């Protein structure tokens, strides 16, 4: 059953962060449009914050997928989710925004679990730790 736990941890990590990988890549492809969308919410210095969001999403998701510095990657996603959720998804009179808020809260929970437990056996973290000692 250890193999099942390891396999499920790997698949769970990938599925948890695919949305962030896709979103980060999408933001690169539509940088100006995304910056304009952010400005509609009263944000200033949108290019700076957008660049940060892209870095957090891409580095965090790749870290989690590879299982390399997994807890750090999960932390990057957690830090990204807090302002994103509070700035863009708190209009609860809009059902879609309420769903987006709850989706982000759920992903926050998944990242907290990953931060607490680590990546598991099918990860670079595990293999490097095992190799060292």
Name each region found by the language model.
Residues 29-44:
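Membrane-interface interhelical connector segments
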Residues 1-29, 47-55, 59, 65-133:
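Extended, low-polarity transmembrane helix blocks
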């Amino acid at each position: 059953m250890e193999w099942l736990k390891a396999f499920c941890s790997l698949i769970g990590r990938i599925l948890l962060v695919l949305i962030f990988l896709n979103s980060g890549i999408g933001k690169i492809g539509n940088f100006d449009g995304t910056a304009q969308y952010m400005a509609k919410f009263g944000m200033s210095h949108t290019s700076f914050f957008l660049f940060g969001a892209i870095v957090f999403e891409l580095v965090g998701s790749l870290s989690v997928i590879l299982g390399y510095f997994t807890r750090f990657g999960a932390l990057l996603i957690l830090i990204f989710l807090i302002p994103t959720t509070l700035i863009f998804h708190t209009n609860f009179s809009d059902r879609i925004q309420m769903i987006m808020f709850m989706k982000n809260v759920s992903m926050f929970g998944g990242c907290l679990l990953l931060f607490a437990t680590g990546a598991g056996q099918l990860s670079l973290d595990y293999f490097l730790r095992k190799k060292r000692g």
